[in-house]
């Protein structure tokens, strides 16, 4: 079994863990390969570009926060990802630093389970060619630097849902419901629910609220504005600048993400400890 290792090189603790992990693998003659930037920063090898790492490994290890895990999962495709939290929140990264070796040993023994998470797929045309972008958390179309309030036109399966005058629109998966969508007033949704949530960003309308829809729907979004360019971000990464009236479609991706599960944690505990959900000032839920 070979492991692909992706490290948040901006965090010294993540680099320290990576060195420790490489030594641990070497002592046990276990195969591993770093993502190129991680390997060059550490001065360790072998390494390969992130786009090629999937061809050389069976399991991925993410050493960083949720952003590192999102980046890793996009390139892992369906291969298992062990998320070690060396970040601030660590909502998606299942394991603490002290649990790293136990998690790896579980995978080596085959005695592990997976959390399979659905993704969305955004389709846009660039130079006349269709491009697909996957996201585990969300796709966000926003006004960017446009100085006025545009209207975001949303259709479901070809039928008009509404026109939102807002700073942007978030289309989130159930996994992504606790990310940007939640910050914009969207609901918390259990991670294996087969739904999308459509959340407007700062809508200039008192009657507009987030809406939850089945993830078997095809969502079409365009921007009604006389001019300007509007950024499309998938999991926080800029994918395209949309012109007025240019349409993107969003649907459930056929590719799911497999996260190695930490069976010591449950979703309610994660909400309470990471988001302080339901906690009163006296700490009665601690």
From Swiss-Prot:
Q: Does the keyword Translocase apply?
A: no
Q: Which HAMAP family match?
A: NAD_kinase (MF_00361)
State the source organism's domain of life.
Answer: Bacteria
Major localization class: cytoplasm
Keywords assigned by UniProt, alphabetized? ATP-binding, Cytoplasm, Kinase, NAD, NADP, Nucleotide-binding, Transferase
Listed name of the protein = NAD kinase
Active-site residues per Swiss-Prot or TrEMBL entry: 66 (proton acceptor)
Q: Which cofactor does it need?
A: a divalent metal cation
The EC designation for this entry is 2.7.1.23
Q: GO molecular function: any one?
A: NAD binding
Q: Which InterPro entries match?
A: ATP-NAD_kinase_N (IPR017438), ATP-NAD_kinase_PpnK-typ_C (IPR017437), NAD/diacylglycerol_kinase_sf (IPR016064), NADK (IPR002504)
Gene Ontology CC terms: cytoplasm
Q: Which GO terms describe its biological process?
A: NAD metabolic process; NADP biosynthetic process
> Family, per the entry?
Belongs to the NAD kinase family.
The UniProt record lists the keyword Transferase: yes
| Intracellular or extracellular location(s) | Cytoplasm
């Amino acid at each position: 079994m070979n492991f692909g290792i992706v490290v948040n090189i901006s965090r010294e603790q993540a680099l320290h863990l990576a060195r420790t992990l490489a030594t641990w693998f070497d002592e046990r003659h276990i195969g591993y390969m770093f993502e190129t930037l991680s390997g060059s920063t550490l001065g360790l090898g072998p390494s390969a570009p992130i786009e090629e790492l999937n061809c050389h490994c069976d399991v991925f290890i993410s050493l960083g926060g949720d952003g590192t895990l999102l980046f890793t999962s996009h390139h892992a495709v369906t291969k298992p990802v062990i998320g070690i939290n060396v970040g601030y929140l660590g909502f998606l990264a299942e394991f603490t630093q002290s649990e790293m070796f136990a998690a790896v040993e579980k995978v080596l023994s085959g005695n592990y389970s997976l959390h399979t998470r659905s993704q969305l797929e955004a389709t846009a045309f660039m130079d006349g060619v269709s491009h697909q972008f996957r996201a585990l958390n969300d796709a966000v179309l926003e006004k960017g630097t446009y100085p006025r309030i545009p209207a975001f036109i949303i259709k479901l399966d070809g039928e008009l849902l509404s026109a939102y005058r807002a700073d942007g629109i978030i289309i989130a998966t159930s996994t992504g419901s606790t990310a940007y969508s939640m910050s914009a007033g969207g609901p918390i949704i259990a991670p294996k629910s087969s739904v999308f949530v459509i959340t407007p960003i700062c809508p200039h309308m008192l009657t507009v609220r987030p809406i939850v829809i089945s993830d078997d729907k095809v969502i079409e979004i365009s921007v009604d504005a006389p001019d300007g360019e509007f950024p499309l971000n998938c999991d926080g990464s800029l994918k395209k600048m949309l012109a007025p009236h240019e349409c993107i479609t969003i649907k459930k991706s056929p590719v799911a993400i497999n996260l190695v599960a930490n069976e010591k944690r449950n979703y309610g505990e994660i909400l309470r400890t990471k988001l302080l959900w339901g906690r009163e000032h006296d700490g009665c839920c601690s």
